[in-house]
Amino acid sequence: MNSFMSLVRTATIALLLIAFLQNANAVKNLQSIVAYHGAVATDDGRCSAIGTNVLRQGGNAIDASVAAALCLGVVSPASSGIGGGAFTMIKLANGTEVAYDSRETAPLSATEDMYGDNPERKKKGSLSVGVPGEVAGLYTAWTQHGKLPWKQLVEPAEKLAAEGFKISKYLYMQMNATRSDILADKGLSELFVSNGELKKPGAICRNPKLADTLSQIAEYGPKAFYNGTVGFNLVSDIQKAGGIITLKDLQNYNVKVKEPLSTEILGYRLLGMPPPSSGGPAMMLILNILAQYGIPSGVSGPLGVHRLVEALKHAFAVRMNLGDPDFVPEVTNVVADMLSPKFAQDLKSKINDEKTFDPKYYGGKWGQIKDHGTSHLSIIDSERNAVSMTSTINGYFGAIMLSPSTGIVLNNEMDDFSIPTKSGGDPDVPPPAPANFIRPGKRPLSSMTPTIVLKDGKVKAALGASGGMYIIAGTTQVYLNHFFLNMDPLSSVVAPRIYHQLIPNKASYENWTTVYSDHFEIPEEIRLVLEKKGQVLTPIAGGTISQLIVEQSDGKSGGISKLVAVSDPRKGGFPSGY
């Protein structure tokens, strides 16, 4: 039993849950670090180190985010990569605040009824692939705000793909969960299978085709991907497999540069991602509801958890009115409501401290989309520029399809769209949301919630999480733990979490032992109180993986603030800094 296990064994109730920190010092060497010049928190320590190396070389947070994100796509290809997309939130020391939407788009030939009577084709295979945006997004942010040469930022990932990387325990778990699909795909089999069996943790994995692709991108930038050899080969592979993406789809792809959502809550200003992210507005709505109870007492203990669950249910009722604002103009009004303190006040008045209600009480008209996967990174540099980026290919290994000629694992982002269903279904299941129906060039709704926290205009934190539909609740709880409940950064991330998506009407709570032998569980005393209030609870083995960096003033360092960076132990990652 390692020291982290003993840490997790003794739990004390805070809001969410637990602080689990009896023996934190032994863990802090890995999961939590203190740095003064710059810090990088990703869900894989190799990529955190690559990001820090970029900072040491004179790069800024934007440079480091490019190198770290590309690294994650190589060593953690079940979660993200250049075959997917991303949302990136940036706050610069000069005052600039900007959001980059490089979410995947529906192909130009896509239609809302393209899956007919076979919705499984929306989940995996060539028809589930959206037009990738990550390369364009990274390059656009770097062009506008980066310092180091582009090629220098791509080379570490290229080297990893060429020379090989060790399969982590977490990646092996993802491989095992999709074993039959990997064995059925030629490209994935070449990467992850040896002698008819999945490669084991610690085995070396090489992706020479991806190394070649990254070499092209390093030399020619996104042109290679969107209008060059890489793009031509990628489209050819997709079409051979029956997909509809064309070179014109790639050529037409564009990054949306947006103004972040912004709201003041209890003295802090939050920057969040606007739609097609539902995460930014939903997190702000939840926090605005909970802030009215008073902190920390109003959001502490079992009652605080009940109030959180109820706020989540209200937020998810509103969430499915959101969609791509370029196609659904009324989304702007929905977001205005979600950021309104008066709207939050009205919802808070509907929360009953003694009981919960069925989904209809919360007013949700539409069914929920269950997005998956993702990877999150947080970076703050010596100038206190901050980047919070969540990237994704959606489900484990996306479309379960690796392009043989490029080495790219392709996303299954089309599964994040809603599709019409025939009438006559379960009367308790709401219909799919028209705001999220497929249209050519449209971006599907997402739960990704990259967040930056400011105080008096200065960066105080960068945070976010991976975990698909659970991301909103997971990111919100980490924020609550630190900023509402005054838990230290490591405790804020380690505390077990609870989730609710309104439909089904169940609260999912962590009760699992990770592949690293760490156990996470909502305490029984909290569960008993919730059940007495009518909450239906179900245990889950998983949830969200959070990366948090907090800026703290430190009287011992001559006025230089320190950075406390935490990578979630649930995925075995660790932060890096100097």
Swiss-Prot record:
GO BP term, example: glutathione catabolic process
Glycosylation sites: 94, 176, 227, 511
GO molecular function terms noted in the UniProt entry: glutathione gamma-glutamylcysteinyltransferase activity; glutathione hydrolase activity; leukotriene C4 gamma-glutamyl transferase activity
Disruption phenotype: No visible phenotype under normal growth conditions.
The keyword Ribosomal protein appears for this protein: no
Pfam family of the protein (one): G_glu_transpept
Keyword Hydrolase: yes
Localization per record: Secreted, Extracellular space, Apoplast
Keywords, sorted A to Z: Acyltransferase, Apoplast, Glycoprotein, Hydrolase, Secreted, Signal, Transferase
UniProt note on tissues of expression: Expressed in roots, immature trichomes and pollen. In developing siliques, specifically expressed in the embryo, endosperm, outer integument and a small portion of the funiculus.
Binding sites annotated in the UniProt record for L-glutamate: 103, 392, 394, 413, 416, 446-447, 467-468
Function: May be required for glutathione transport into developing seeds.
Family stated for the protein in its record: Belongs to the gamma-glutamyltransferase family.
Name assigned to this protein: Glutathione hydrolase 2
Gene, per the UniProt record: GGT2
